Amino acid sequence: MAVTKEVGSFIEAPAFYGNLSGKENLEIVCKILGLPKSAVMDALELVGLTQYKDRLAKKYSLGMKQRLGLASALIGRPPILILDEPTNGLDPVGIHEIRTLIRSLPQKFDCTVLVSSHLLSEIELMADNIGILNHGRLLFEGSLDELKQRAVSQGYPTDNLEDTFLALIDADNRQRGGER
């Protein structure tokens, strides 16, 4: 249970009890983590779901489910948050709101946030440091500026993270014998 309190996680498609409200789902998380019920309303407010707290989870839109998953990860204010595709299913306004929230978390709650996403344009707007993986191999770890410097030194494009990423992956795949 100690690890559960230290790491909050949000997986791409969070699962909830559909016949319970968003609030009731978070109350279960509170009970498991030994947190006071007051943490539920704080978490719902943080992700913008307060007005939908009594709606059954099965009636939530995909974006609302994403927000509820994020609330579940944040509820205990863990020092480490692992978020997998946190903006999946959100409209542009929701993406902006969640991105802004995620960017604020390290300073607001003194935590480390790890985000996994295939939306590289989002990562570019969200991250201070990035890691690039290919077939389980860490190709790069550092700041976006360091990545751009490395890309320039190797003749890779630097217009955006996606182009740089694709060039790094392509070079690694060619080096490994064309594996994709």
Model-derived segments and their meaning:
Residues 81-85:
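Catalytic Walker B motif of ABC-type/P-loop ATPase nucleotide-binding domains
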Residues 70:
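Hydrophobic anchor residue at the start of the ABC signature
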Residues 77:
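Conserved catalytic motifs of ABC-family nucleotide-binding domains
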Residues 27, 31, 37-52:
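Conserved ABC ATPase "signature" region
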Residues 96-109:
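Helical segment within the ABC ATPase nucleotide-binding domain
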